[in-house]
A protein has these predicted regions:
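Short beta-strand His + acidic residue motifs that chelate non-heme Fe in jelly-roll/DSBH
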Residues: 49-51, 69-70, 87, 92-99
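Conserved small/polar residues in nucleotide/adenosyl-binding loops
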Residues: 109-115
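A short, N-terminal "cap"/entry segment at the start of jelly-roll beta-barrel domains
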Residues: 1-35
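Conserved short histidine dyad/triad with adjacent acidic residue
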Residues: 23-26, 37-54, 89
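Short acidic-glycine-tyrosine-enriched beta hairpin
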Residues: 73-90
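Glycine- and acidic-residue-biased ligand/ion/polar-headgroup-sensing regions
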Residues: 45, 55-73
């Protein structure tokens, strides 16, 4: 068995990335030639990301609560635990918690991007 202990504390999400209170725990950081990064992102009720894109796309996996997401020009979609959402490369989108519910997700993207 190998246990890799976390060496970082929970970070408050930056105000220019999020509206409302959002907290981030790093899950995977790039090693060697990898460009993979992942984070566990905790959204308080009504908190969400700003509109944004990822040049290589982004996958989120809802682990707890009820969330919402939207791509530009599309309807707001409700997402729940077990739902996986893939945003296409360059697709303008946002994601976050429903107005009255917490939501936690695992976000994955290139390490040079926010997750």
């Amino acid at each position: 068995m190998q246990i890799t202990r976390s060496s970082t504390d929970t970070q408050k999400g930056p105000a220019d990335w999020f509206t409302g209170d959002v907290y981030i725990d790093a899950v995977a950081a790039p090693a060697g030639t990898s460009t993979f990064a992942a984070a566990l992102v905790h959204f308080t009720p009504g908190a969400r990301t700003a509109w944004h894109t990822h040049p290589h796309g982004q996958t989120i996996f809802v682990t707890e609560g009820v969330g919402r997401c939207q791509r530009e020009g599309g309807p707001i979609e409700v997402i729940r635990p077990g739902d996986r959402v893939f945003f296409e490369p360059g697709e303008n989108h946002w994601h976050g918690a429903a107005p009255t519910r917490l939501m936690t997700q695992i976000g994955r993207a290139s390490c040079r991007e926010r997750v």
